[in-house]
Amino acid sequence: LAAQGRYEAALEAAVETGKRFAVHNGGNPALVAWRSQAALCLHALGDTAAAQAYAHEELELAERWGAPYAIGHALRVAGLVSPMPDAVKLLERSVEVLRASPARLELAYALVDLGTRRRRQGQTAMARSLLQEGMDLAQRCGADPVVKEARSELRALGARPRRSYLTGPEALTPSETRVAGLAATGLTNRQIAQRLYVTVKTVEVHLSN
């Protein structure tokens, strides 16, 4: 819902999820981070105070539970709904926590969010480094929306985003991985195309990458 811009409906859904979760599972934010979702929706709707209240409540709970992913995520959301310079401090803490965790995708989000705010501060070199790292990590995770956001921010800096340095299986998109896997079994391009419901040309393009 939030991705469609339906923030009021998304907020209502998040709060309702929170009520049900509290009845059955308690308050572990690592399981359902509904307060973070509510905070982002409220921020988009212009209710900054309520957004920050939800975000910091989730951060307190995350720190109580101690799971690095939950803490890093809560710090990132708190940074997104906070004014400068608090936003940068919170996002820096998020990156620090997530670097020590296996949560690679959440780290990619945090790096891009921090890089975006560094760009707004005019710290171009630092912003470029953060955004490029976040983009490379997002590419590993197959997170195209994060990659696009990072590229957009890099272009806003006047930088030309470099192509991913990744090689081998990590450099492949999910679609390319599926095609390569089928090709490795000995199927022809036409057979692969029929199996995946794509054109032979699409298969050829994937195998050429």
What are these regions (language model features)?
Residues 113, 155, 162-209:
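Helix-turn-helix DNA-binding segment
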Residues 5-9, 21-37, 62-76, 98-110, ...:
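Alpha-solenoid helical repeat architecture
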Residues 1-4, 31-45, 72-84, 109-120, ...:
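Tandem amphipathic alpha-helical repeat scaffolds
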Residues 13-15, 21, 54-55, 91, ...:
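Inward-facing hydrophobic residues that define packing positions of alpha-helical scaffold repeats
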Residues 43-46, 56-100:
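Alpha-helical adaptor scaffolds
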